């Protein structure tokens, strides 16, 4: 069924999580980037339009600065023996890493797609780009303009500026605008993009083969769930595996994304991006995932 969906879909959003993009040591996986670019190029040769939602700015920032980030609950970065430190609290450090890492991330994507004579375009989004009608219309127009010219849009949240836990700026030093709220995770961002663009398919690549009835990393008897027709019935009753320090989402955000898009008639596939050639394997029917079917 997943193979048939790929064959029929003309407009596909592919979301790539940090867990998928990062190697075990936290550095971006160049081989995965190359595989993904090759698969997207193949899809485009078949007449499909592809939008990529890519996490990984913080991971790329860590790699670029040759330092280690703080633990998930920590406040700040450890000193690196040759590079010193990035001072500040946890949120400020993450934003600084994202500022450095986003440039590194898009550079690596550009190189990966250039091998297939494909150009990429960068979108750094905020929640208001989807909640404000004028800004949403501009996003949709620019996406369409690029796609008509066979450019691959690569989207991420503007993590260098969007954060909910940094100190507020004094009133006399800020412009009087409504406070910015984060999208918070790229599962949600990819769902927003799929809805705005009216995609035919949303693919979420994670580090596990879809949804299970319990955590497969902790339970050997965990059962894979290949098909979901009622997202609400899964809430609190399923698992995707243990969380990874590189990611911000989890099973809850993926179920939220599935709920949003399936209500709009868009199918969602959750699959493992760590397999060899994950996208092409799904297209051939050689890889398994969880398919969330649209609400009828």
UniProtKB/Swiss-Prot annotation:
Catalysed reaction, written as an equation: L-glutamate + ATP = L-glutamyl 5-phosphate + ADP
Q: Give UniProt keywords alphabetically.
A: Amino-acid biosynthesis, ATP-binding, Cytoplasm, Kinase, Nucleotide-binding, Proline biosynthesis, Transferase
Q: What PROSITE patterns does this protein map onto?
A: GLUTAMATE_5_KINASE
The protein's predominant localisation is: cytoplasm
Please give the Gene Ontology molecular function terms for this protein. Answer: ATP binding; glutamate 5-kinase activity
Query: Which Enzyme Commission numbers does its entry carry?
Result: 2.7.2.11
The alphabetized list of GO BP terms reads: L-proline biosynthetic process
Residues holding substrate: 55, 159, 186
Amino acids binding ATP: 15, 206-207, 248-254
Pathway in which this enzyme or protein is active: Amino-acid biosynthesis; L-proline biosynthesis; L-glutamate 5-semialdehyde from L-glutamate: step 1/2
State a GO cellular component annotated for this protein: cytosol
Q: Where are the transmembrane segments?
A: none
EC class name: transferase
Output the Pfam families linked to this UniProt entry. Answer: AA_kinase
Q: Does the keyword Amino-acid biosynthesis apply?
A: yes
Which compartment or compartments is the protein found in? Cytoplasm
Q: What does this protein do?
A: Catalyzes the transfer of a phosphate group to glutamate to form L-glutamate 5-phosphate.
Tell me which PANTHER family the record gives: GLUTAMATE 5-KINASE, ISOPENTENYL PHOSPHATE KINASE
Q: What is this protein called?
A: Glutamate 5-kinase
């Amino acid at each position: 069924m997943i193979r048939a969906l790929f064959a029929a879909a003309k407009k596909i959003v592919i979301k790539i999580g940090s867990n998928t993009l990062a190697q075990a040591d936290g550095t971006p996986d160049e081989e995965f980037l190359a595989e993904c670019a090759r698969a997207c190029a193949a899809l485009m040769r078949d007449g499909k339009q592809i939008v990529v939602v890519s996490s990984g700015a913080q991971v790329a920032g860590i790699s670029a600065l040759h330092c280690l980030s703080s633990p998930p609950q920590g406040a700040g970065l450890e000193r690196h023996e040759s590079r010193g430190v990035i001072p500040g609290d946890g949120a400020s450090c993450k934003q600084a890493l994202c500022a450095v890492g986003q440039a590194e991330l898009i550079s690596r994507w550009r190189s990966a797609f250039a091998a297939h004579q494909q150009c990429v375009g960068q979108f750094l989004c905020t929640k208001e780009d989807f909640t404000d009608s004028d800004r949403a219309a501009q996003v949709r127009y620019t996406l369409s303009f690029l796609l008509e010219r066979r450019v691959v849009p690569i989207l991420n949240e503007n993590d260098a500026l969007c954060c909910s836990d940094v100190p507020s700026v004094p009133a006399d030093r800020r412009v009087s605008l409504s406070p910015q709220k984060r999208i918070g995770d790229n599962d949600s961002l990819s769902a927003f993009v799929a809805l705005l663009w009216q995609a035919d398919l949303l693919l979420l690549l994670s580090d596990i083969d879809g949804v299970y009835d319990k955590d497969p990393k902790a339970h050997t008897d965990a059962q894979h769930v290949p098909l979901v027709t009622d997202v609400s019935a899964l809430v609190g009753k399923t698992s995707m595996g243990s969380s990874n320090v590189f990611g911000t989402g989890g099973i809850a955000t993926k179920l939220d994304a599935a709920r949003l898009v399936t209500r709009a008639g868009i199918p969602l596939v959750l699959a493992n991006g760590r397999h060899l050639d994950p996208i092409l394997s799904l297209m051939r029917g050689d890889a398994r995932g969880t398919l969330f079917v649209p609400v009828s």
